């Protein structure tokens, strides 16, 4: 049985940062988001239980509140280097069900390449959450969201090795840490 959860996420992927929040909607999502799934399905998945996941870093930027059709503002720590491990900081704890490996989620998120003021992707800017199966996205999203609760608001930094790498096969995919 597949679980269906809604995740509102401003997310840092591989070389970008963001926030993620989850809320349950009780509906199943039949389709995965094209961008997150495209790279994740072509490579061997990382075993999340063997991955070192940090819960905070002094290098993480400050992220403001998103608004209607606008990504949140981001303020980078001057001269800070990107964390080398997947880093998942809980900004606000939720009280819903835990996100499982077979969950479908709907996420509101913004993604930035590390140290960039410009988003490479943002569901806030599109005006609607992105729906995807947790097993169909990059390892950084999958391992970063796994076990978090519906209602959580997260800031996630994803190193390139858990995303699209330093030289993505898809020229539209972001390279490095986000």
Give the residues covered by each predicted segment.
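Cross-family detector of peptidyl-prolyl cis-trans isomerase
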Residues: 2-178
